Regions:
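DUTPase catalytic domain/fold
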Residues: 1-130
Length: 130
């Protein structure tokens, strides 16, 4: 159902998902978002998201849901405590196949930038039989 599957990302009731290597950042003075590659960044040298900044990100994982399984994305609680916020548009219908999840994320801190990098564990997918 998920590729790549990483055994250590499996939790008792969910699967951790990670950031891919592209984000979309809001451009100043326009409604458009600009695709930005973050593949050159790492945990040691991250890309910094400014306070209040909104962006779209995709998961590294690709999902292949059968017709009888739905999924719900939720932010990891540790990331919420860091100051991340998610727009709660994370429902995946049964039969959703061959796609990465797009996440609507925001740095909700007032003063400090938050780091991101490809492979960063950002959230969890809960799978439901329907």
């Amino acid at each position: 159902m998920v590729t790549p599957y990483v055994e250590e990302h499996l939790n008792p009731a969910s699967l951790d998902v990670t950031l891919g290597d592209r984000i979309m950042i809001e451009l100043t003075g326009t409604r458009e978002l600009e695709i930005t590659g973050i593949h050159n960044y790492s945990e040691e040298q991250p890309y910094w998201i400014k306070p209040g900044e909104f962006f779209l990100a995709e998961t590294r994982e690709i999902f292949h849901l059968p017709d009888y399984v739905g999924a719900q994305f939720v932010l990891k609680s540790s990331r919420a405590r860091d100051g991340w916020d998610h727009a709660e548009a994370g429902w995946c219908d049964p039969g959703w196949y061959g796609s990465r999840l797009t996440m609507e994320l925001k740095n909700s801190r007032r003063l400090n930038a938050l780091p991101i990098w490809p492979g960063m564990r950002i959230g969890q997918m809960k799978f439901l039989l329907v």
